[in-house]
UniProtKB/Swiss-Prot annotation:
GO terms for cellular component: ribonucleoprotein complex; ribosome. It comes from the Bacteria. Belongs to the bacterial ribosomal protein bS21 family. This is Small ribosomal subunit protein bS21. GO terms for molecular function: structural constituent of ribosome. One of its GO terms (biological process) is translation. It comes from Sulfurovum sp. (strain NBC37-1). Keywords: Ribonucleoprotein, Ribosomal protein.
């Protein structure tokens, strides 16, 4: 659980912002959403395959974009 240190000057908005940033860094919300429903091994492999493909296409796009500037 993320813990934040507050000073007497911090408002509620500041405290909330710090807490939200800390929880985003620790991937708490992402992990909770992932654990909400059971994911079979085939679904995991399928997601990994899609993510890998996206990553490759992104690199290819960036490479082509860079080459067009030369």
């Amino acid at each position: 659980m993320p813990g934040i240190k507050l000073t007497p000057r911090d408002s509620f908005d500041d405290a909330y912002r710090k807490f939200k940033r800390q929880s985003d860094r620790n991937l708490i919300v992402t992990e909770a959403r992932a654990r909400q429903h059971y994911e079979t091994k085939t679904e995991k492999r399928k997601k990994e395959k899609i993510a890998t493909r996206k990553k490759i296409l992104k690199k290819l796009f960036m490479l082509r974009r860079y080459e067009s500037r030369l």
